[in-house]
Amino acid sequence: MITVNIQEIKKRLQTIHDETDEWFQQLLHDERKGVQRLVQQWYKQKEAEKRERERFLHMLQYEQALYDKGIRYIAGVDEVGRGPLAGPVVAAAVILPKDVYLPHVDDSKKLSETKREQLFSIIQQMALAIGIGIVSAREIDERNIYEATKKAMMQAVHALAIAPEHLLIDAMHIPLSIPQTSIIKGDAHSVSIAASSIIAKVTRDRMMKQLGEKYPQYGFEKHMGYGTKEHLQAIERYGVIEEHRRSFAPIRERLKRGE
């Protein structure tokens, strides 16, 4: 029987990746309840890791099909901020290496702020290229949100340090000569698009937090410009500022009533 204590066993188990490991096999015969509990936790962890890798590989199917055709540089493109009443629309384009593995990458809306921030840093370290596009509230009013979104996406693609050979885009088509595939709910079905959604989301959230420091009465750092009850009440009380989208109904109606 292994004589090391439970804490030492717990620490060493983190280095074991295969149940055929000789030391692990000895643990299976250790009668201490604490040891057997750690063994079961190890099995659960490995099963969770297996499921996550399978999910990731499923999300890589669009990229893999392009890799199989000899295409190397694939940019995922996504945007954040089409619906808010204030702030810009932000798009990101991300080119990942072919052999990338990004566990837990997903549609940014499904992730906690902490997880998004963690993945944001990891993606920045691992990506071959990242491009950002930002279109202001004023230009959204001038163009309309759909055209502004396309412009932000094109800006993001043009900002890439590496020219992409193919674009994977979340439910959009942009007027560029680069071959592209539009994927419905792409941020949940493509690793590259999910990565771009995280970059765009964190980038925009940070901008809105800065706006919250400039205009603390509006609470932008909480609602990120979306039409929450708190935000609508602040608009009624304090009026419309430059960063509000005047073409959006709640803002337009507030302006009609006079500031």
UniProtKB/Swiss-Prot annotation:
Pfam families xrefs: RNase_HII (PF01351)
Subcellular localization, as worded in the UniProt entry: Cytoplasm
Entry EC no(s): 3.1.26.4
GO cellular component, one term: ribonuclease H2 complex
Protein residues bound to a divalent metal cation: 78-79, 170
Catalyzed reactions per annotation: Endonucleolytic cleavage to 5'-phosphomonoester
HAMAP family: RNase_HII_B
Protein name, entry field: Ribonuclease HII
Taxonomic lineage from the root: Bacteria, Bacillati, Bacillota, Bacilli, Bacillales
